[in-house]
Structures are given as structure tokens and as C-alpha cells.
């Protein structure tokens, strides 16, 4: 039996601000924006090419805004993806990789999968890691 991850919730303070950031800056696609009860609203967006949605809203999680850390967005070319996101106004750190447990600027020298990263912060301080994974490499 297959088990597929459908939705990851992230805590935000301002639903409209988060929606604008994820749609306009990150380039995600809106799939749901609806009230679900008195004082509750759920928004779901999906990164291009992903089957897992990101959800946020009012009254849907008790987690503190900005407490989501280490969510990974994988891309086949981290240099191109970082440039695109920076151009769209996303606060994104430099591309870096680990050498002997220390961060070094730039992508992994051989561009090995799972080795190059860049940090992204949403308006609430939720931290994403952009990670290079080129599935065509095998």
C-alpha cells in the first residue's frame, strides 16, 4: 500500500500576508482558501511539481508562528532556483554545503544530490531549506 504525504501545516500570524508570500514570491499554486467554521479559515498552496500541499490559516494549529523549521523544498538546480526566488523577492540565504561539519559557501563541488542548501524564511520566520536533488542523476 502506498502512503503519500498530503499536507504540512505551518503556523502564521497573518493569513493574507502568508498567502501573498507563498503565491507571489514563492510561486506556489493556490488549491484551497475557505472558511471552515466560525473564526477558522484554511488556505492550502502547493509548490510547483509537488503533490504535497502546505496549509495555513486561522484556528487550524496551536503551534507558534515561525516555529516550523527545516522543511525541505527540493530542486534539480539550486543555483537557478535560488536566483529565481531572489528575483521574486524571497529572503534567501547563500547556497552552501558541508565540509567536515562546517558550512562552506557555494554548491557542493560535484553537485552531488542532497549536499547543497539555501535557507528561506517566510514572513513569520518559518524556515525552509532549498535543497538540490536532481533525480535524473539516479
Which residues make up each language-model segment?
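Acidic di-acidic motifs
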Residues: 14, 77, 122
Amino acid at each position: 500500500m502506498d502512503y503519500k504525504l498530503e499536507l504540512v501545516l505551518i503556523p502564521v500570524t497573518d493569513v493574507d500576508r502568508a498567502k501573498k508570500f507563498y503565491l507571489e514570491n514563492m510561486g506556489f499554486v493556490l488549491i484551497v482558501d475557505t472558511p471552515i467554521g466560525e473564526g477558522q479559515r484554511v488556505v492550502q498552496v502547493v509548490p510547483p511539481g509537488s503533490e504535497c500541499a502546505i496549509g495555513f490559516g486561522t484556528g487550524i494549529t496551536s503551534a507558534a508562528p515561525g516555529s516550523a523549521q527545516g522543511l525541505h523544498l527540493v530542486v534539480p538546480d539550486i543555483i537557478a532556483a535560488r536566483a529565481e526566488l531572489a528575483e521574486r523577492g524571497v529572503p534567501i540565504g547563500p547556497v552552501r554545503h558541508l565540509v567536515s561539519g562546517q558550512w562552506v559557501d557555494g554548491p557542493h563541488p560535484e553537485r552531488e544530490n542532497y549536499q547543497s542548501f539555501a535557507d528561506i524564511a517566510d514572513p513569520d520566520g518559518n524556515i525552509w531549506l532549498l535543497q538540490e536533488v536532481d533525480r535524473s542523476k539516479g
